[in-house]
Amino acid sequence: LGGNAEMNFYVEGLRFPDKDFEGLISISLSLLEPSSQGFPETPIFTDRVVFRVAPWIMTPNTLNPVEVFVCSTSDNYQFLKGMRRLVENSGYKLKVCHEYMNRGDRWMQDEIEFGYIDSPHQRFPVVLDSPRDGELQDFPYDVLLGPDFGYVTRTAYDEEVSSLDSFGNLEVSPPVTINGKNYPLGRIIIGVAFPTATKGRNMTKVVQDFLWAQKVQEPIALFSDWLLVGHVDEFMTFVPAPDKKGFRLLLASPDAGYKLFRGLQNDGHGQAKMFDGLGAEEEITVDEILSDDKLRAENNYVQSCIDWNRDVLKRELGLDDDDIIDLPILFHVTEENRAVAYYPDMVNMIVLGKNLGIPKPFGPKVDGRCALEAEMTSLMEGLGLSCTYIDDFASYHKLLGEVHCGSNVRREPFSFKWWNLEM
């Protein structure tokens, strides 16, 4: 008949890449023409098109926030008040998950991880739901999922779900280059048992397989099983920096903590008290901390665990010592030989552009000012970052979590397009 005709084909990705699905879909097209009556049609054109399902992409602390999520509980008014002030002053939206929805589960970071998918014609956020399935488990599906907000989860059928499956144990670095290899979307970071351990807790294989299968943010496994809760966000985070590198790695450091306390003692402040104002049963002097040989031995062990991870991160992210800032944080070790923060863990912070929401450490005061806050503020001011200290002592720290554990941030996507990566 002649003339022109156009036909549109649409392909919808219904599954993310995973261990058993590479994410590639092949479609073969053939244009046939009739020949003589009674004979098969013959091809005049054929082509094959391969589609790749868009991967799920995580967003690091260096990307701009869009909105912040926290829970409201019967006992976290003080925390919520501090978070509300920080988020409003930073110019972002705060979304509060109320108690009828969270049912007393305050650990917003542990239940979900925000990411996104991207294509030449559309992009939208996708939340990854943790297999921890606490009382917050209905929140991502009932509240977040929508026409332009995706949802994905992985269920561990044949594996035991542990604390390491909570997403305080799932982070992502800013973009890095290692030995000439670019990671323009950064690298995923998870915590697992020590490589040679015969026993220990790990992130479930079904979640690890999913993360590896996305291919665009090749994961790094750190050793986090030395912690009682076992999350990487208990000893590390990233903050933006105004230089070519673009970020700094912050690490908890007992050595830096003891250096600070010894300095206070040498300057005549040995009787200054930790946890001042939190009750006589909490208070302890600098002299008492420094004379506690058991605490010192515990922190030597913790420092060796963090040093192992420091070396892994330097190697896998292409970092020098100048790219790392050590924060003065002490730990103590429980009966199970696993560590928890001795005072509110300042590395477990929320990063909102140049504003940091940091657990208030209740350190010893010198001339009316907390020495730990003064040191932290000094370290961050050099990067142009502003510190807000949030009281999470009773409502989070005492329950073995801090500010980062109790909050979550949805961020803007990368400007870099994943399909420009060599895969």
Q: Model-derived features: where do they sit?
A:
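Histidine/cysteine-enriched polar flanking segments
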Residues: 1-423
